[in-house]
């Protein structure tokens, strides 16, 4: 795929709608080939660095398994296993790693870090997550949506994101809607809306591609007719405890539960989540939330919805690997 060869993958708006379509088609092919035992290795002899300043289960496993499937070797650099940004600048780290590796994945903090890595390394750099964007997650989401509504184009689908829409997921969803023409509805309190400039830019692009972007606080009108309802965690262990009560009070009404699913009026509506999800009391944080804030049976999503037939979160999680593989194959093989 010469269009992508040696290019970085930093955010979705760096690509055109047709390029995004090509990546999704490649991911679907690679997935089918793996399932059928017909996968052709395109990355034999390639060395890949995986920089993780923030831990992850799905992102790390997806990159590692995808690389191994394709014949590449990986080196994991965790937050305590490198000098990046501490004893060595991002620019210097990029220039060192670029001499040793064929590609670099970065998962961590500011978008400027992954952009600096891409600028100075001289090799493809892939954004596994930054504070601002999560593009590989959206590739998996879009592939999953295609699989569950195979007869529909993206500009015939309605995707609702309920909860805190001002984060990297909200930003990347806006970019995805801009390119695909999705009917995207961000159903959230105004305090949790994304930056107006990005909303305006993406809304104009979405309209040209047959879609629309809506921001609303009204749950009933926001979810009506939805094909998919998506949410993400409200708090994480890395955030100060004083933020928890404030965030929960702000978002409690936007929990994805059976009532919200019913308000869509669509008995076939599906539930999406980028994971991990606090849908029960079986994790340390889930237990703490239940005890301190009365959130038994789920925080951002109820256990009832998460464990229902409507939930396709694990299809989505699997597709992280197939879509990440597509990104690596597209950018590292001619």
Swiss-Prot record:
Annotated carbamoyl phosphate binding sites: 56-59, 83, 107, 134-137, 274-275, 320
Pathway the protein contributes to: Amino-acid biosynthesis; L-arginine biosynthesis; L-arginine from L-ornithine and carbamoyl phosphate: step 1/3
EC identifiers of the protein: 2.1.3.3
Origin superkingdom: Bacteria
UniProt cross-references to SUPFAM superfamilies, sorted A to Z: Aspartate/ornithine carbamoyltransferase
Function, in words: Reversibly catalyzes the transfer of the carbamoyl group from carbamoyl phosphate (CP) to the N(epsilon) atom of ornithine (ORN) to produce L-citrulline.
HAMAP family: OTCase
Protein name: Ornithine carbamoyltransferase
Protein source organism: Salmonella typhi
UniProt lineage: Bacteria, Pseudomonadati, Pseudomonadota, Gammaproteobacteria, Enterobacterales
């Amino acid at each position: 795929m010469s269009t992508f060869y040696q290019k970085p993958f930093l955010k979705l708006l760096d690509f055109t709608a047709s390029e995004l379509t090509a990546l999704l088609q490649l991911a679907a092919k690679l997935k089918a080939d793996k399932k059928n035992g017909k996968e052709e290795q395109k990355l034999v002899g390639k060395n890949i660095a995986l920089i993780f300043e923030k831990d992850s289960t799905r992102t790390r496993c997806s990159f590692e398994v995808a690389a191994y499937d394709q014949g590449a070797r990986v080196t994991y650099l965790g937050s305590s296993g490198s000098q990046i940004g501490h004893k060595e600048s991002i620019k210097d780290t990029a220039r060192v790693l670029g001499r040793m590796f064929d590609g670099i994945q970065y998962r961590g903090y500011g978008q400027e870090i992954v952009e600096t890595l891409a600028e100075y390394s001289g090799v493809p750099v892939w954004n596994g997550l930054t504070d601002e964007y999560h593009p590989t997650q959206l590739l998996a989401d879009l592939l999953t949506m295609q699989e569950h509504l195979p007869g529909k184009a993206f500009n015939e689908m309605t995707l609702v994101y309920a909860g805190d829409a001002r984060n990297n997921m909200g930003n990347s969803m806006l970019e995805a809607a801009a390119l695909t023409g999705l009917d995207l509805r961000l159903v959230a309190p105004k305090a949790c809306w994304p930056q107006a400039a990005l909303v305006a830019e993406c809304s104009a692009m979405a309209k040209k591609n047959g879609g629309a972007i809506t921001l609303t606080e009204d749950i009933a009108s926001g979810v009506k007719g939805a094909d998919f309802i998506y949410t993400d965690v409200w708090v994480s262990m890395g955030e100060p405890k004083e933020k928890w009560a404030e965030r929960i009070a702000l978002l409690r009404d936007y929990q994805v539960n059976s009532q919200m699913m019913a308000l869509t009026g669509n008995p076939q509506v599906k539930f999406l989540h980028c994971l991990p999800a606090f849908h029960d009391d079986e994790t340390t944080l889930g237990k703490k939330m239940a005890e301190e804030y009365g959130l038994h049976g789920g925080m951002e999503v109820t256990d009832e919805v998460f464990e229902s037939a409507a939930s396709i979160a694990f299809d989505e999680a699997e597709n992280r690997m197939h879509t990440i593989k597509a990104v690596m194959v597209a950018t590292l093989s001619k």
